[in-house]
Amino acid sequence: MLNEKQRISLTDAAERYSSNLTTQARSYLEGRGLTEEVISTFLLGSVVDPIAGHELATGMISIPYRTPAGVVGMKFRRIDDGTPKYLWPTGQKVGLFNVIDLHKPSDTIAICEGEIDTIVLSGVVGIPSVGVAGVSQWKPWFPKLFESYGRILIFADNDVKEDGRNPGQELAKRIKEDLDRAEIIHLPDNTDVNEVMLQYGNDWFLERMAA
């Protein structure tokens, strides 16, 4: 667990990166359907002047893990064709993304894979949402966070990889094992939340919520 000084440092870094968002990064995010308001709310930024420990992320998009107490983690994403596509600071522990939405007055919560998809569901579509960074990052204590919700929706990516794996469906199955009352919403073949929003609009999700 981070102490107050560490949270302040990460929050300051996130705000610095947000203020340094490059034209290229902004164009990339807008191409994913994110508005200026959403980009600002989620403190998305560019690593132009990295703090200690973030040097390898220079030039990448910064995605802060925000909580009511401040930023507790950071993930970075390339917007070019280089590798690795994503980067975590060494030694950083991974929790749920966007736990701020767990504090919203809502009887419904959505769970999906990945940060950008979570931002789309929460910030663009308007469904309170949290994100999991893959099957291995679903923790045994996470189910306790959802006990108060009347409805839990798992928006499961349906994107088959070159090796034949379907990580989104694997994650949905894993979550369902711990949260049996959760509903799995299967996305169209070879899509994720972001792609569905861009192709079909917010109504695709809202119609399934109303079903």
Predicted feature residues:
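TOPRIM metal-binding catalytic domain and adjacent DNA-binding surface shared by DnaG-type primases
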Residues: 1-62, 66-68, 101-104, 211
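RNase H-like polynucleotidyl transferase catalytic core
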Residues: 130-135, 180-191
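Acidic beta-strand-to-loop metal/phosphate-binding motif
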Residues: 111, 149-163, 186
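Phosphate-handling DNA/RNA-contact segment within nucleic-acid enzymes
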Residues: 6, 49-151, 166-167
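Phosphate- and divalent-cation-binding pockets in alpha/beta enzyme and binding domains
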Residues: 120, 170, 192-193
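Short, surface-exposed amphipathic charged segments that create phosphate/polyanion-binding patches used
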Residues: 58-60, 144-149, 192-206
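Short, aromatic/basic amphipathic alpha-helical patches
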Residues: 165-178
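A charged alpha-helical hairpin associated with nucleic-acid processing machineries
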Residues: 105, 185-188, 204-211
